[in-house]
């Protein structure tokens, strides 16, 4: 007797509301949305429920501005997704699922200089403080994601700006800190963790 193949992960899905605490008009997303105002008809997003998958939300349309990682769960107001970010955003206007969010198979290499030059560190685990693990600089010049998906933070303790790093975007290669996102004005990365799947 043969057994049926194990089912794959459920498709990514999340529901958005235009008011806090899951009130007001709502819109459900199953794929990338460059502008929730146009596609979903919501004037703003004030609460989010992630049913499946992991998502990255952006404060502006077209995947621009501050990034916020949204893992499975409820986000009843902006403080739930901003957390201890140095930049609080009370609006989210574009969304996309995170690719390759396999927590068990994640590898990233940090480089001191641009274009994968200088000292390097290979990581396969979460690090709440890169300086305490021996990374001599507060900055990371470039990085390569070999597998999985990661979220890097500006400060130790998973605080500050968030940068979502995926193997299947940019081929996993970020040659300069400017490729981390439109809000990346510095290469300061001091903590990093694997994305929860």
UniProtKB/Swiss-Prot annotation:
Name of protein: Beta-crystallin A2
Alphabetical UniProt keywords: Cataract, Disease variant, Eye lens protein, Repeat
Function: Crystallins are the dominant structural components of the vertebrate eye lens.
Gene3D superfamilies xref list: Crystallins
Example GO molecular function: identical protein binding
PANTHER family (alphabetical): BETA-CRYSTALLIN A2, BETA/GAMMA CRYSTALLIN
Gene coding for it: CRYBA2
Biological process, per Gene Ontology: lens development in camera-type eye; visual perception
Organism for this UniProt entry: Homo sapiens
Renumbered residue ranges of the record's region Connecting peptide: 100-105
N-terminal arm as annotated region, ranges: 1-11
């Amino acid at each position: 007797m043969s057994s049926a193949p194990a089912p794959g992960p459920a498709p990514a899905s999340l529901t958005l509301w235009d008011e806090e605490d899951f009130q007001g008009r709502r819109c459900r997303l199953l794929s990338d949305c460059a502008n929730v105002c146009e596609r979903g008809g919501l004037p703003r997003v004030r609460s989010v429920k992630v049913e499946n998958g992991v998502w990255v939300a952006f404060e502006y349309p077209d995947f621009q501005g501050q990034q916020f990682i949204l893992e499975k769960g409820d986000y009843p107001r902006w403080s739930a997704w901003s957390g201890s970010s140095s930049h609080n955003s009370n609006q989210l206007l574009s969304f996309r699922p995170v690719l390759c969010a396999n927590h068990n198979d994640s590898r990233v290499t940090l480089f001191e200089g641009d274009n994968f030059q200088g000292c390097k560190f290979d990581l396969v685990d979460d690090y709440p403080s890169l300086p305490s693990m021996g990374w001599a600089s507060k900055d990371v010049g470039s990085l390569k994601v070999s597998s999985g998906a990661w979220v890097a933070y500006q400060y130790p303790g998973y605080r500050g700006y968030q940068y979502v790093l995926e193997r299947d975007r940019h081929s996993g290669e970020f040659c300069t800190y400017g490729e981390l996102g439109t809000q990346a004005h510095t290469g300061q990365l001091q903590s990093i963790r694997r994305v929860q799947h």
